């Protein structure tokens, strides 16, 4: 499902990730463990295409994240440590916006958004502005956007 080969990320003279290689199989759960500054979030950001690697490759379901980003990203749902939420949108507006970004077909959008919102128990918050939600509800909105479209892989960075 995911293959990482000789992944490197350098920021000037600092090497954040140094020749990392691994494979992630479908249907299994994996985790990165390490101290602060070990490169866990940087690795996840490279896997998801948020930042480019200095060297190495990331392939998701046969698609290189840099050469075929749209195809690769269709396979991934990503919840970064700080979810990219728009505070001046309601929960429902935001979820519809994400559905459009993910190119969810119009005939499935309404039902899929409703289903995902119910899964993470935010349906009652759908008309509230995101800026007025508690941190816990904001995290749920972030999780909902990650699983919208039912991607094959969900990547969670500091999901608690």
Predicted regions and their residues:
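Conserved catalytic motifs of ABC-family nucleotide-binding domains
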Residues: 150
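Catalytic Walker B motif of ABC-type/P-loop ATPase nucleotide-binding domains
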Residues: 154-157
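Conserved ABC ATPase signature
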Residues: 129-133
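Walker A (P-loop) phosphate-binding loop of ABC-type ATPase nucleotide-binding domains
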Residues: 35-39
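Conserved ABC transporter NBD signature motif
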Residues: 56-67, 71-72, 76
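Conserved ABC ATPase "signature" region
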Residues: 96, 100, 107-125
């Amino acid at each position: 499902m995911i293959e990482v080969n000789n992944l490197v990320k350098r920021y000037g003279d600092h090497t954040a990730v140094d020749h990392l290689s691994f494979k992630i199989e479908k249907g299994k759960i994996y985790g990165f463990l390490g101290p602060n500054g070990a490169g866990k979030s940087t690795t996840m950001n490279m896997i998801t295409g948020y930042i480019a690697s200095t060297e190495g490759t990331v392939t998701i379901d046969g698609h290189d994240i840099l050469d075929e980003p749209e195809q690769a990203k269709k396979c991934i749902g990503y919840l970064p440590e700080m979810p990219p939420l728009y505070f001046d949108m309601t929960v429902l507006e935001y979820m519809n916006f994400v559905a459009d970004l993910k190119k969810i077909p119009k005939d499935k959008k309404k039902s899929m958004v409703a289903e995902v919102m119910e899964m993470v128990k935010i349906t009652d918050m759908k008309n509230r502005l995101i800026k007025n939600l508690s941190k816990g509800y904001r995290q749920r909105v972030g999780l909902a956007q990650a699983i919208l479209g039912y991607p094959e892989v969900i990547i969670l960075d500091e999901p608690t």
